[in-house]
Amino acid sequence: MKSYFFLLIFLCVSCFEKNTDIDRLNNAANNPFRKDSNKIRDKYRNPIDTLTFFEISRDKKILEIVPGSGWYSEIISHYMKNTKNFTVAIYDKPPVKILNKIQDEFINYFSLNKDKFGEINVIKIDNNYELKDNKEKYDLVLTFRNTHNWLDSGNAKKLYKSVNKILNKGGVLGVVQHRANENSELNFKKGYVKESYLINLIEKQGFELLEKSEINSNSKDLKNYKKGVWTLPPRLVEGENNKAKYLEIGESDRMTLKFIKK
């Protein structure tokens, strides 16, 4: 009877902690200080479901690789506030000029808004696509819609091999990437990648696929645009040409993959 009582207490505490964590993640996604232009994309990017799928937790050391303008960083940093457990990896020498501006704006934005989001640690990716961090091992590494660039430049294997080195044993890698049709030819310049191709490449760098999700799928995505995935929102590179059509399609069809370090 006594053991049953303690089991009941344990289950109640676990349930409370889980609910508290979900509430905290919801609060981070609904943070009033998030940019409005980011909030309106939640219906496409599904941040709460995606981060829950990747098993985000405040007691984990988390690394986001190439955060861009900080769409996900706004949410993760607020969720991880006061833990000092959230780090981003940016390029030491960006491969294209526009990334200099994007990275500078990212650093300035989050430095000026620590009280609104939380502190973010920064490490660098060197010219050999090695993650330079001699201090930490991470429990969860995330990257969103970046892999086509690394594949196009021939650096994806090196980058994911480096991720494997800085993950703790049993650590999780979460990847979201624009998804090509399986019968299509490889063309990373369009932004799309075959799911089977990417799984195979990442597993060869010391990972095992744990699970995949259709959280970010979009069956309306035709994937046959001359200007690639950037034809769709939010970029809409064709301007007013067929804008209504592309808005109706929405953002790209994306794979959502969860790997574990072997």
Spans of features found by a protein language model:
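Conserved class I S-adenosyl-L-methionine
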Residues: 58-68
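Short glycine-dipeptide loop
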Residues: 59, 82-83, 167-173
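Conserved beta-strand signature within the Rossmann-like core of class I S-adenosyl-L-methionine
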Residues: 87-89, 170-179
